């Protein structure tokens, strides 16, 4: 599901809200979540999961085209850990 598909579905389920208001709300929520992670904070949505940052240590990688070694810096990457309810629902369809 893409962001536009999510907005479309939410707007169709809430016909009393203008589609633009739903779009603005979704964009604002995602922007706030990104800013929270950028500040190094953890986000927990009960029943859904949690978002946090994990540190990737510096390492030596390879350029896939040339095969030459490339030094990669350490960095933080977003990490999502699904909650129990989400895992259980996903296993129904697996």
From Swiss-Prot:
Keywords: DNA recombination, DNA-binding, Transcription, Transcription regulation, Translation regulation. Transmembrane segments: none annotated. Signal peptide: none annotated. One of its GO terms (molecular function) is structural constituent of chromatin. InterPro entries: Hist_DNA-bd, Histone-like_DNA-bd_CS, IHF-like_DNA-bd_dom_sf, IHF_beta. PROSITE patterns: HISTONE_LIKE. GO terms for cellular component: chromosome; cytosol. GO terms for biological process: DNA recombination; regulation of DNA-templated transcription; regulation of translation. Pfam families: Bac_DNA_binding. It comes from the Bacteria. Gene3D superfamilies: IHF-like DNA-binding proteins (4.10.520.10). Heterodimer of an alpha and a beta chain. This protein is one of the two subunits of integration host factor, a specific DNA-binding protein that functions in genetic recombination as well as in transcriptional and translational control. Belongs to the bacterial histone-like protein family. This is Integration host factor subunit beta. The lineage of its organism: Bacteria, Pseudomonadati, Pseudomonadota, Gammaproteobacteria, Enterobacterales. The gene is ihfB.
